[in-house]
Amino acid sequence: MDVRQSIHSEHAKTLDTQALRREFLIENIFVADEYTMFYSHIDRIIVGGIMPVSHSVEIGGEVGKQLGVSRLLDRRELGVINIGGAGAIIVDGQRHDIGHRDALYIGKGAKELVFVSNEASRPAKFYYNCAPAHTAYPTKKVSPADVAPVTLGDNLTSNRRTINKYFVPDVLETCQLSMGLTELAPGNLWNTMPCHTHERRMEVYLYFNMEEDSCVFHMMGQPQETRHIVMRNEQAVISPSWSIHSGVGTKAYTFIWGMVGENQVFDDMDHVAVQDLR
């Protein structure tokens, strides 16, 4: 488990490129036949990836020992979105088939967590966010057909994008975890611009669906102290509550957003005008 400490905004603005990357960038999300796990002190979120190739991957009691409990979900909830080939997640003996861009919410108290791919040549890539939970909600699969997409932006401002809200109160109940997937239209480069912060939630982005010769300049920092981190395909970045979180790519891309904090009101954000950025 890779543990990332929280960091004050006054400290963050003094960091150079390598230090910023060390604090906020998560580079190796998917590793064949393993699960990865990155624990942030910011709202105690855990993010990572699971990519079964030659055999199934189980998250067992060994993780619980690192969290001071018996198993991962003794006091947590889990959200998973598959960005790879078809696969399945077995939760306490019940198999849930999870295709490309399908998602599964797993409530507090689940014990057995086994992840499998249907084909080794095209393995599933299960990206997950895991957050503290105070009560148990039912495990539920969410497919793209279950989500009402919202298209925002304009080709003229190069920010036309479609937002798919997978885990939000209108779709299912969770304790605090919200997740979704935003896809930029071809030829569009900007996400979340004009940008915002949200004092009551932190956020993690996973950038993917990127070509090898492309990158995203992820904008972060306080609105008057902006910095950037260069992102490659299938890398994630941690965004504290005090930080903007926006990006511009050399080509179109897709990203998964995950939020935890004290509320789940999607529009509870503090907008920042472009002319106020520094």
Curated annotation (Swiss-Prot):
What domain of life does the UniProt record list for this protein's source?
Answer: Bacteria
For Zn(2+), which residues are the binding ones? 196, 198, 203, 245
Substrates-to-products reaction catalysed? 5-dehydro-4-deoxy-D-glucuronate = 3-deoxy-D-glycero-2,5-hexodiulosonate
Enzyme Commission no: 5.3.1.17
Any one biological process term the GO annotation gives: D-galacturonate catabolic process
Enzyme group, top EC level? isomerase
Q: Which UniProt keywords apply?
A: Isomerase, Metal-binding, Zinc
Copy out the cofactor comment.
Answer: Binds 1 zinc ion per subunit.
Q: In which pathway does it act?
A: Glycan metabolism; pectin degradation; 2-dehydro-3-deoxy-D-gluconate from pectin: step 4/5
Q: Which cofactor does it need?
A: Zn(2+)
Q: List the disulfide bonds.
A: none
Sorted alphabetically, which Pfam families does this protein's record hold?
KduI (PF04962)
A single Gene Ontology MF term assigned here is:
zinc ion binding
The record's listing under PANTHER family reads: 4-DEOXY-L-THREO-5-HEXOSULOSE-URONATE KETOL-ISOMERASE
User: Which family, according to the similarity comment?
Assistant: Belongs to the KduI family.
Q: What does this protein do?
A: Catalyzes the isomerization of 5-dehydro-4-deoxy-D-glucuronate to 3-deoxy-D-glycero-2,5-hexodiulosonate.
Name the chain's protein.
Answer: 4-deoxy-L-threo-5-hexosulose-uronate ketol-isomerase
Name the species this protein comes from.
Answer: Salmonella paratyphi B (strain ATCC BAA-1250 / SPB7)
Name of the encoding gene? kduI
